[in-house]
């Protein structure tokens, strides 16, 4: 807004105040954000009108704008919370805690827990820090003093706290002056003009010769809806804002708006675009180059003329050949195994059979699909950790970080990679099969959700977006050119594009907002709601004239639409999706050849003609697709890559695509090497991209001494699933040839990192249950003596993240009161009892039992909040309902399951289905089921809405083994796969059908009975402990052993040689670190174990041998392993 328009707002504020429009004046203050009325703010705080206080503040700042703003909102919401507690309105206090204060837990989790603990006190003044809290009135006054200091110090309120000095009734004076001027221009001015309206200019026709007399109009008569004002600037008249921005309207003065952009990025246009000639705009992975010069037609259209142009005209579209449904790529040409779950794919912009693939293990791979050959693989590696932010360094211990997006630059010379934590990588691609490291940028705090290339002013740039709600633009030296703020949720996707000479970016966020940005510092130009109001991606047609978006709502409903750019409205909505998409994630889509739309849903690929909302065709691609497959067309539209459930992808082709692939025949890549090299115009010693410094700087570190080693090719795929049976192979002459796989064996303490928890006076003889806190900062162990012990890691220079780590020994934590979390034992020997424990999601409460009543402990004070369910029968397993911490499933000694409501202290229902005691319970939030396991080797499935039994499955025992002993169950991270653990086996079940997919039986070096096992944080590994002290680490896919940890690696010689020998009784996986786990031992000690920092992970993924690895049985082929459908990009 121009300075004169800003001043006009102040004039209106003065007028509203003088005319006593009290509510309106404060509404305008808030909406404009130009003047913060401290007096009004104080009145509302003193009155305790908290909703109005926050609403008024929202016009000037948001919670996460800066630390001052955060403190302001926190103090207000804390006061609101304390007042509810002081009124003993617990329901209101809980509501404030969950809705208003929860946002601060991400910034200070300990403080949020402490605030939560106030609910447990009869009078919150019992808290030492709040002991001096007086009455409500004095508390508000004290808080207001603090708020005023924060507001005055907050840079966002600078120059907004003082109203400008104005003469009284300044707006009335200006209007009177304008009317006098108009009256002077009257051809026949009347001596006493009658002013009846301000909506039109004044004119009068009095008798001949009358002189104009001054006009004075009382402004009280001025209607609140003002008319047209005289020009406020030398260039454009001030006009009321339109009802809502259109996708075209905000571009009307784009050329003028870009004049403030540095010339290195966007050159300002010297030709302003008339408002009625706004170019409509609203993701194409490849950004086409801009015209080298404006076309003659465009110059004519932009040149000022004597008559207006009603609408924008476009060059005639390029004639497209007729096409039919037979042109859809639906034939399976080949199936290729990537080796880990595929997260992103992109075909080369000019070499249409080169496919770039990104995976969950952080590896990028380039495939020549015509030869079914892997040209190179680059495993995840941080190039220069010292150049990264301390925040990333604290989380960079993971061996790999998943890839969110891979993409080619428009000319195919650069590869962009966006990772799920902080980083982007740029690689220079040198044909045929070499790459060079160009840039590593710590781009965003949290995940980098999307990456794309753009060319403002014909200069290649990289655009990124992330969880930190920002969109950033980088040049090829790693310098940040722009950082766009405005989204209120993590930014999910970006779509850079251009129309004529106007360059812009569309972005979408997880709250379903669509915003548009020019390359300037003026903020977003539009703000729309995407259909579904959740994850949405946007794409332009190949010719750049039509805009589409596809997204999914949180409820699983999917939307594919075409936009009317000029109006900002939806032009057509395509039908054919299921009401609720199968699987957890987001529907993916792509477009090709200006004719075809394709989306992956319901284990198939669906196609639409862009001009018809009815689904045209669909294909299951011979089966094996996930619920929501990812997909990508090549630029010719004759090949389509789609992901499969077994860590691979399929290439679908039409007749033209099949001819292209057959041209390769069975010839190896070497036969085509000369063709690739002849087409490359780059000299190997020259920079691939102009403007990239050949010297290695902070952002463009190059590791020339570490050639990337590709992952071994998986040969376990089912050959029958390939239409063209040609096995993948790697050139014999490659310098980075894959090494033979070897099982990682950790045999001594020098091969891993181990931290032993400090001993305590109440240490038990055994650790029978073990849990990490959900925040990852503590370990909770239940001993055979019925006492729970808690260890916490402190945040310090040695451990900046404050999370559990084997690098630092934590402290045994106890409250100042010295209380101990001692369970009721009901006069029984706790050594003979079946222990059970469960932790609430916010780490505030722990529930446990050890033969006696179930006790609910406060984790901060260790006080017993309540006890319930006295024996007999005794409780044997506990599980919180995932959606309601007040609902608990309790497994019992008598084989029943009690569904207990803590709030009303009542058993809602009893479930009967087992023959012996309950040993395991697991909820699936996605499938809405509870799975129970018992000492009878049975699995039962219960519907959580009706609590009816849906199914009962007997665990298949190895030959000669009796169906007895404890069985544990655990869901993976997306609740679709169930890990079943028994001393005789590890097994993975498809939870929706309760059918066993894989089974592993103890053998060879791991032949002892299994004592316990657990999924890793990301559910990609299984940590299993054995009664001889060995620990096995398995890949979830096929339950293949990738690492064995021998007892000497983590146990002392005394422990190994003791009688009986020491071994792990329980295993717990860290909730955030995928390769960290803890074990509770039979001697009462607890240890945290991690791989060496130089290794970063527990071995590598083993190859499949002859389809089924030794010792692992499967109920399906090696290619029928349905991977978890994670939230897809």
UniProtKB/Swiss-Prot annotation:
A Gene Ontology term for the protein's cellular component: plasma membrane
Domain of life: Eukaryota
WD repeats: 337-377, 398-437, 443-485, 487-527, 579-618, 623-662, 762-801, 829-867, 870-910, 913-952, 1005-1044
GO biological process: positive regulation of pattern recognition receptor signaling pathway; regulation of DNA-templated transcription
Sequence ranges assigned to domain CTLH in this UniProt record: 34-92
Complexes and interactors: Tetramer. Interacts with D53. Interacts with WOX1. Interacts with MOF1.
Recorded domain comment: The N-terminal TOPLESS domain (TPD)(1-209) binds directly to a 12-amino acid LxLxL EAR motif peptide, but no binding if the leucin residues are replaced.
Name this protein carries in UniProt: Protein TPR1
The organism of origin for this protein: Oryza sativa subsp. japonica
Lineage, highest ranks first: Eukaryota, Viridiplantae, Streptophyta, Embryophyta, Tracheophyta
Name of the gene this protein is made from: TPR1
